[in-house]
């Protein structure tokens, strides 16, 4: 994000006055710097009285209700404060759009790195460290699934009833909505679409134990400690809900690179040597989880199905000239790879 674009969305004078009213330091907001990330949300780091902050607010034209999404994120971060889930610490939040034009919150900066962007020397130079990084990712999903969401104040945060039954029709409806985009070739360009959907419906687990789930859990949405292979924080909480936490492991199954480092969804790390296979991670998850993991493959197939249909949306928009053609074709290719992976897990 350019300096000009973030300045249009974050009025530092109004933010400073708001912080004054909250007792969050005094004086100027120094060193305001936009941070890159995996979303279109505004992330702005600044310092006041020697304390660093990161502000997060929705973009100018968010998909859906950006204010409600931001409020939900802040609620989750607040609820996680007393848990062992690694997360950015919430400092304060504003639910009204009156201050900056959108709801926003302030959190502590994370001392860590995104492995999909690059590895520091400690991690790049030691295959054993990289191996542990993978299990740390799974540990994060396990910790999140163990949270007592009622005790944490998140009762009613998601629609538990019929959660699994809604998945296939919900994401198929999203795919069908892409017909509104001119020149999109339609569902027929996705291999085995109906076959995967039918398999998911036939093999759907009989029940689930509801829990807190991230909703987009993969290597690019965590940050690692600079001094160890452990997680520093899980980030990008905008899809978090109460549902079936096994789907977070299913998301790992869908996005985990193959042994040669090739990926279904452009989420990878270099060097890839040292990282365990997805089968090893599934076995580890099953050994550490108190949930019924006998149908973990089903969640992996669902992860492929869901992510593939979400990515196809960018391709559909690109066909109508509403997104980059290059990006659209790249993500359509990822969709195809995800459905090919789903077919392999179905056998």
Where are these regions (language model features)?
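ATP-binding pocket architecture of kinase catalytic cores
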Residues: 32-196, 203-212, 226
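All-alpha amphipathic helical-bundle segments outside canonical DNA-binding/catalytic cores
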Residues: 158-159, 292-303
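Catalytic-loop of the protein kinase fold
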Residues: 212-214, 219
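Activation of the activation-loop gatekeeper triad in protein kinase-fold domains
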Residues: 235-240
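Active-site activation/catalytic loop segments of kinase-like enzymes and analogous catalytic loops
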Residues: 247-289, 303-320
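Helical subdomain adjoining the active site within ATP-dependent kinase catalytic cores
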Residues: 291, 295, 309-347
